[in-house]
Amino acid sequence: MVLPAMFGAKEPHVIGFEPCHCPEAERERIERMSEENERRAREEAEKRREAYRRAGIRPRFLDAESPMAGGIMAGVREGRGAYVFGPVGTGKTHLASAVARMAVDDGMRVRVTDMPGIIARLKSTFGTQASEEDVLSGLSRCGLLVIDDLGKEPPTDWTLTQVFRVVNDRYETMRPVVVTSQYDLKALGGRLSRNGDIDIALAIVSRLSEMCAKHEMRGADRRLHGQG
């Protein structure tokens, strides 16, 4: 506040307020700052979790972390994928989800899916204005594609052809893919060709072999031991 000059003074009087520096006021300011920082941290964490959900990471794995994820992610940044295989319950999906989280945090467009998910999305276009090409393009052109549990269900010729189209497109455009499976690549070829064309199955396996570093997961079923 500025008051006119008084009592013969040549300059106006300036009356202002200074913050109180007493211990109680300082403590209140620190508490307010701490609460604000916590609020912002919660909002940022929720934004990240929503980004993970949009990428297709399942709720159980939204907080997934793994000491192996950093090495795989380093390869992803250079355009190299990963083939993670091993018995049921050894942490394959957990690891793939941890990599997907890191890719989202890197700003990559990520899509996490599985064979039934791919087929469901393709079939959802039947009788609509959407096309199979729209779905396949979304899977082929994202920065990182994660296909979980490949080979769990033996595919038909039609299903196998769609998977080949996605894998081949990513192979030709040098976009990374992370795949999990119960089978090593040799066994995967036999599994995929059980109800489908063996040549297409082997073509998928060949491309994955070149595109991906192999990571074998070993050990007992973590779910049965309460570690899932």
PLM-predicted stretches and their roles:
Residues 79-97:
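Walker A/P-loop nucleotide-binding motif
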Residues 93-107:
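P-loop NTPase Walker A phosphate-binding motif
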Residues 1-70, 226-228:
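A short, basic N-terminal segment
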Residues 108-109, 141-144, 171-179:
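Loop/turn-to-beta-strand initiation segments
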Residues 73, 104-141, 154-157, 161:
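Short glycine-rich substrate-engagement loop in P-loop NTPases that contacts/grips substrate
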Residues 57, 68-81, 85:
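P-loop NTPase catalytic core of nucleic-acid-dependent motor ATPases
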